[in-house]
Amino acid sequence: MRISALEGCRVALWGWGRESRAAYRAFRAAFPKQPLTLFCTIAEATEVQALADPVLSIETEVSVPRLAAFDVVIKSPGISPYSPLAVAATAAGAHFIGGTQLWFAAHADTDGVVPGAVCVTGTKGKSTTTALLAHLLRAAGHCTALAGNIGLPLLELLTPQPAPEYWAIELSSYQTADVAGSGARPALALVLNVFPEHLDWHGGEQRYINDKLSLVTVARPPIALLNAADPRLASLVLPQSDLRWFNQRDGWHVRGQVVYRGEQAVLDTALIPLPGAHNGSNVCAVLATLEALGLNAVALAPAACNFRPLPNRLQFLGERDGILWVNDSISTTPHATLAALDCFLGRRRVAVLVGGYDRGVNWECFAARITRKVPLDIVTMGANGPHIQALLAPLAAGRFGLHAAVDLPHAVALARTALGAQGGVLLLSPGAPSFGAYQDYVERGRHFAILAGFDPEVISSISGLGIA
């Protein structure tokens, strides 16, 4: 559905997050005088009233009859379509769409393909990969948009003039189904990996996987690029796409710490400001994408060395009193925490802070790995902290210190004490969302920076968003 199709319709917005605010602005730009209803919280209503929009109605209670009363409801991506309320409303006739769906429908050619659109998804690494892709496309002299889940909703760039040559678009699992439902197809879809995450939103592991992979299984991009080292991805068959791979020995892959194209050594990952083996894989994904787009990836690879890392993603805040403070607040799965630990274990003493909102993710994989490569200390916190603590307690004796904190300040204090005068790495890599304690992972990362004694404003901006 194109945004022009909303003219004269009864339209509502559900939610008032970043994506919904972008949808509001896009709707108002198209239809300045058309009535619109917003379902939001009481706290959000106060902010919205300041807009002084005479044809905007604000409702702080949402129900099945009210949702079903509209022709179209533009839903915030954070609201699950599998929630009882959304399911009941759909059964009653409510029609939900998302902002991502509106953008893709607006930009599709007659064959359904959005020219120059490269969509990146995966359980972890997608923000860094998308930003690095935009960085290298710009290094090649191509006007490129960096947008999507990374921090700039696509609807903020609905009708840019002039249009960029390429769109580097990060998509969450909440948004991939939006693309699939739009009827449009990205020119290239890149899937980095798939681990269980957001199980509360999707209602189970298999549905999460299906929704995530709908970007390639349902949207049918002309080119699909997948990680050959991921078992779930390696088994995919996509007959309607030109299927390509990275992390294969005859293509882009890492050996030791060097990026190779087949047998050709291309780039030493030690020169790139992205620590960890998983980031070597992300670099390969980007270079394989450039190659699939017809660009000289080997020649462009050295430009990765001046990439500016993103905040909250294995971000080195700085060193104070012998302690290196590392902010990996984006980490919302145990797999991500393990990848973060791999950057430091065996090199420096590490105290890691884990735990947060409990959405039912299994931490047994973390427990199994942690006994083979152990940090100095683990501090648990948050709603799932007691669960992680109980899982690790039988394994800790004689191997690593294990502490329980009531919140992030307490966790930081415990970790500092554990590291002591010898210092080491104090790593925030929670492996869980921030809900309940913070608005989002960004706010959690900012609080961590404050506790570490660093200016949160300096460390929290993402460079390169938008068109350049």
From Swiss-Prot:
Keyword field contains Nucleotide-binding: yes
Annotated pathway: Cell wall biogenesis; peptidoglycan biosynthesis
GO molecular function, one term: UDP-N-acetylmuramoylalanine-D-glutamate ligase activity
Pfam families: Mur_ligase_M
Main subcellular location: cytoplasm
Catalytic reactions on record: UDP-N-acetyl-alpha-D-muramoyl-L-alanine + L-glutamate + ATP = UDP-N-acetyl-alpha-D-muramoyl-L-alanyl-L-glutamate + ADP + phosphate + H(+)
Its EC number(s): 6.3.2.53
Keyword Nucleus: no
Enzyme class: ligase
Localization, UniProt: Cytoplasm
Keywords of the record: ATP-binding, Cell cycle, Cell division, Cell shape, Cell wall biogenesis/degradation, Cytoplasm, Ligase, Nucleotide-binding, Peptidoglycan synthesis
GO terms for biological process, alphabetical: cell division; cell wall organization; peptidoglycan biosynthetic process; regulation of cell shape
Residues binding ATP, per UniProt: G122, T123, K124, G125, K126, S127, T128
Family affiliation: Belongs to the MurCDEF family. MurD2 subfamily.
UniProt xrefs under HAMAP family: MurD (MF_00639), MurD2_subfam (MF_02208)
Summary of the function given for this chain in its UniProt record: Cell wall formation. Catalyzes the addition of L-glutamate to the nucleotide precursor UDP-N-acetylmuramoyl-L-alanine.
Protein name: UDP-N-acetylmuramoyl-L-alanine--L-glutamate ligase
Organism in which the protein naturally occurs: Xylella fastidiosa (strain Temecula1 / ATCC 700964)
